[in-house]
A protein has these predicted regions:
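Helical scaffold of the NTase/Pol beta-like nucleotidyltransferase catalytic core
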Residues: 1-21, 51-53, 279
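Short, charged amphipathic alpha-helical segments flanked by flexible coils
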Residues: 196-227
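Broad structural signal for hydrophobic residues in well-ordered alpha-helices, predominantly aliphatic
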Residues: 9, 13, 63, 207-208
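Terminal (often C-terminal) interaction modules
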Residues: 224-279
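Extended, well-ordered alpha-helical segments in internal regulatory regions
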Residues: 186-195
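Catalytic metal-binding acidic patch
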Residues: 22-24, 28-58, 73-78
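Conserved NTP/Mg2+-binding pocket subregion across the NTase superfamily
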Residues: 54, 58-175, 179-182, 188, ...
C-alpha cells in the first residue's frame, strides 16, 4: 500500500517531493492488519503552494478507493521544511506525528530531510493530544477548523459519549473503532508522562505497571482485540464495567497537567467533558 501511495505522490508532486516516510506502527512496530492505520509522511519543497492541500487530498482520496481495507485506512501527513520548523503555518503534521517522524520515520523515497523538523516540547505534545482527544473522543461538540484534519476518523454523528456509556453501540462499530476508543487515552497518558510516542503495546505496559491503573483488565483485553476481535457479549460486559473508569482517570490526569502548563481553558473543557460523561 505504501509503495503504491509513494508512486502516486511522486507522479503528482514531481521534484517537489523531497522525501516520503512510513510512520506509525509501520515504522515503529506493532502493526495490526485488523485495526492499524497506514500512515505516510511527506516533506515537500518550499514554498508552500495554495494548491498543495488539494493535491494531497485528491491523491489520498483516489488511493483510498483502491478496494482493500488497508487502502481505506491511508492517512497522509505533509509539510515543507518551513512549516515543519514552525516558521509558517500550513500542511498537516501535528506535534505527535512530527515526533513520530523524528524518532521512527522510515524513509521510503527521496533524501532524509528530518533535520528540518522541529522537535515538539512536552507541553506541546500534551496540549496537542488533549485537543485531539476533545475532538475525536467526544469531549468537544465542535472541532476548531485547524484541528479537523487531525481527526479524520472522528465519527460523523459525534456520538462517542453515547458509545462510552452504552458499550454495545461501540462494539457494533467493529474492532478498529473499539480498540482506538479504549487505547487512545492510554497512549495519551504515556506521551504526557514521557514525552515519547512509542508503540501502543509499550504505552499499555507502562500504564499497567502502575500501582493504580483503573480498567487494567480492559486495557489488557484491548491489546488482544487488536489481533483478534472479541465476542460481542464479552466486550460489552467488560466495557460496561471499566470504560468510564478509564476515561475519568484520563480526564482527571489531564485536568491537572493542563492547569500546570497554564492551559486553563483547555482544562475547563476537560472538566465539562467529565461532567457530560458522568451525567
Amino acid at each position: 500500500m505504501l509503495a503504491k501511495a509513494v508512486s502516486a505522490y511522486r507522479a503528482a508532486l514531481g521534484p517537489r517531493l523531497i522525501a516520503g516516510y512510513a510512520l506509525g506502527s509501520l515504522a515503529h512496530g506493532g502493526f495490526s492488519p485488523l485495526v492499524s492505520d497506514v500512515d505516510l509522511g511527506l516533506i515537500l519543497q518550499d514554498p508552500l503552494r495554495a494548491k498543495d492541500r488539494m493535491t494531497i487530498y485528491k491523491v489520498a482520496r483516489s488511493l483510498r478507493t483502491g478496494g482493500s481495507t488497508l487502502d481505506e485506512r491511508l492517512s497522509v501527513f505533509w509539510g515543507t521544511p518551513s512549516t515543519l520548523r514552525g516558521q509558517r503555518r500550513g500542511g498537516r503534521f501535528p506535534p505527535l506525528d512530527r515526533l513520530d517522524l523524528l524518532d521512527y520515520g522510515r524513509l521510503l523515497t527521496g533524501q532524509d530531510a528530518r533535520s528540518s523538523v522541529a522537535r515538539p516540547e512536552q507541553a506541546e505534545l500534551l496540549v496537542a493530544g488533549a485537543e485531539f482527544a476533545l475532538g475525536y473522543l467526544g469531549g468537544a461538540q465542535k472541532l476548531p477548523g485547524r484541528l479537523r484534519d487531525w481527526a479524520p476518523l472522528r465519527p460523523r454523528d459525534d456520538h462517542v459519549l453515547n458509545e462510552i456509556r452504552a458499550p454495545s453501540q461501540l462494539v457494533s462499530r467493529g474492532p478498529r473503532r473499539l480498540t482506538k476508543v479504549v487505547l487512545f487515552p492510554v497512549r495519551f497518558l504515556f506521551t504526557a508522562e514521557t514525552g515519547q510516542v512509542g508503540t501502543i503495546t509499550l504505552a499499555a505496559e507502562h500504564y499497567l505497571a502502575k500501582a493504580y491503573a483503573p480498567a487494567a483488565s480492559l486495557v489488557t483485553a484491548a491489546l488482544a482485540w487488536r489481533l483478534e476481535p472479541p465476542t460481542d457479549d464479552e466486550a460489552t460486559a467488560l466495557l460496561g464495567r471499566e470504560l468510564v473508569l478509564l476515561y475519568v482517570h484520563y480526564i482527571d490526569d489531564h485536568i491537572t497537567r493542563l492547569r500546570a502548563v497554564n492551559r486553563q481553558r483547555l482544562a475547563d473543557s476537560f472538566r465539562r467533558w467529565r461532567a457530560r460523561l458522568l451525567a
